[in-house]
Amino acid sequence: MNDVTSCGALGNNRLAGQTCRLALRLDGTIGSKQISTDPDWMAQALSEAYSALVLASPNPRVGCVIVGGDGRLAGSGYTQRAGGPHAEVMALRDAALRGHSVEGATVYVTLEPCAHQGRTGPCCDALIKAGVAKVVAAVPDPNPLVSGQGFARLRAAGVSVEIGPGATASRELNLGFFSRMVRNIPWVRMKVAASLDGVTALQNGSSQWITG
């Protein structure tokens, strides 16, 4: 990973996203390049979300990075196991552990901050309480319990809200979640192994290895 341009274009590449995240320093640089654009920072948030790939279910895989007023990385995090902290709270905790203030900061998150009380409190309230100035989200949350309410509460508290880049990558990372919320059915993946002539066993009924 040699420059910020390649980092910002990561979007849909899981492995590249993880590599890019590991290369990001707390001063907001990768190599000698300074990260400064919304696509660059959202790429970092998406790479955090990929860290929750096998962890967050049945919750969506969400990543978050917080950028201080000086343009440097203040904190980052991703959604933990069901019932555990969401990405925004993890990023706030990370910033606190590092001794960074998030007052007036910009938050990049891959899904609209939640606005309902479940096993954890509303993430939008945590961001408001922390004093962040702006939230850039990749995509609205299709959950009927949220569905724009997170954005509304943030705006009502004086926090600037933008729908930023990364929508496609965020949805693709959470196909099952979006399918359940929007269509009320799970996203089913099926693999069929067949020979070139369309059969799955020999004529005598015995099976053979077709795929690994």
What are these regions (language model features)?
Residues M1-C7, N13-R14, C20-L55, L73, ...:
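Zinc-dependent deaminase
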Residues L92-Q117:
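Mobile, glycine- and charge-enriched loop segments
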Residues P58-V62, P85, P186-V188:
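Short, basic and Ser/Thr-rich N-terminal targeting/leader segments
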